Amino acid sequence: MEKEDNGSKQSSSASVVSSRRRRRVVEPVEATLQRWEEEGLARARRVQAKGSKKGCMRGKGGPENPVCRFRGVRQRVWGKWVAEIREPVSHRGANSSRSKRLWLGTFATAAEAALAYDRAASVMYGPYARLNFPEDLGGGRKKDEEAESSGGYWLETNKAGNGVIETEGGKDYVVYNEDAIELGHDKTQNPMTDNEIVNPAVKSEEGYSYDRFKLDNGLLYNEPQSSSYHQGGGFDSYFEYFRF
């Protein structure tokens, strides 16, 4: 009898362990987003929550968390950036008070993590999505034909991750913050350094031609080749995309 009892206990414990293991299976992020894109359109969705404005808790995460204002993005202690998003509540049922948190991955810069968040939010929430770059990304996902016809560069001026980032389409972008950008006036004497990005000449609507952009402490200096530009005179701010 004792042997039979021990055998039944072992079988029951094994079934419990196996059931726990089955519950731990996590659906890949790509599959989750594809499911929302295919099936979620017919579901009633709530407007995405605004979220907390306080950001990451003080003393938690990386040193640049206090200056990061991207939605769904935070920094690890070792410097990497992570992105995550909550699925709409309606996906788990009308009686659910909290939604499932979806891990989107680890990234080298805050801007890359913010782009990943925007793509996921656009798929899950559609027109109700709250995006980090609502105008620049066109709803979080750039169509192939738009990416081919656009060669714009964005400059991100916060401390989170200045520099060029790569998207899935192979296009390089530099994210910018319009409020923190200044255009230099008397920078024609500065030699080029390793920070500079050399691009083909860009023709603007005003007739100027720009072929060099210098990244220096979050400031964007460009040197026009027009004869009408005189040293120290400067030019008006121009924050639109440059089309190559």
UniProtKB/Swiss-Prot annotation:
Residues 69-134 bind DNA. Induction: By abscisic acid (ABA) treatment. Induced by salt, heat and drought stresses. One of its GO terms (cellular component) is nucleus. A motif (Nuclear localization signal) lies at residues 20-46. It is found in: Nucleus. Expressed in xylem tissues, stigma, anthers and region where sepals and petals attach the peduncle. InterPro entries: AP2/ERF_dom, AP2/ERF_dom_sf, DNA-bd_dom_sf. Keywords: Abscisic acid signaling pathway, Activator, DNA-binding, Nucleus, Stress response, Transcription, Transcription regulation. Gene3D superfamilies: AP2/ERF domain. Residues 1-25 are annotated as: Disordered. Transcriptional activator that binds specifically to the DNA sequence 5'-[AG]CCGAC-3'. Binding to the C-repeat/DRE element mediates abscisic acid-inducible transcription. Involved in the regulation of plant development and tolerance to abiotic stresses. Belongs to the AP2/ERF transcription factor family. ERF subfamily. This is Dehydration-responsive element-binding protein 2E. The gene is DREB2E.
